Amino acid sequence: MKEKINELAGRLLDLPDSILDLQMQLIDRSAELQKVESQIGERSSEIKYIINNALDDNGKKLYSNAELRDAAFISDAKDDILLPSLNVDRELIQSSIQSIRVKVENLSNHQRNIRVLISYLTTDSNIDNL
């Protein structure tokens, strides 16, 4: 039983480093997400600028109301080369962040469980049974 306690204690000592590694990955992925979201915002603004300044053959605004501009944005955003790619990148990064969060939560739960188990196994009433 002492071997099991030592094994659990060793695992307990290793878990903080594993959790820290994942948290650092989370920070990196969050920074990547911010960058991609910024790029999406910039590209969306560029598309909207073009739409807002589009003129017909008579020099009048091509999209005279918000509904037309919104429809043009949706259409142009779909046809854009960069924006769909950035949206896919954002979704992949968000999925990765969720996965890392689940792993951190799992390791944290594992850490708490080991602490409780070691505490239980090393109490005076239980140590006599070892």
Go through each PLM region and give its residues.
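Extended alpha-helical coiled-coil "stalk/arm" regions
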Residues: 30-72
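Long amphipathic alpha-helical coiled-coil segments
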Residues: 30-41, 81-119
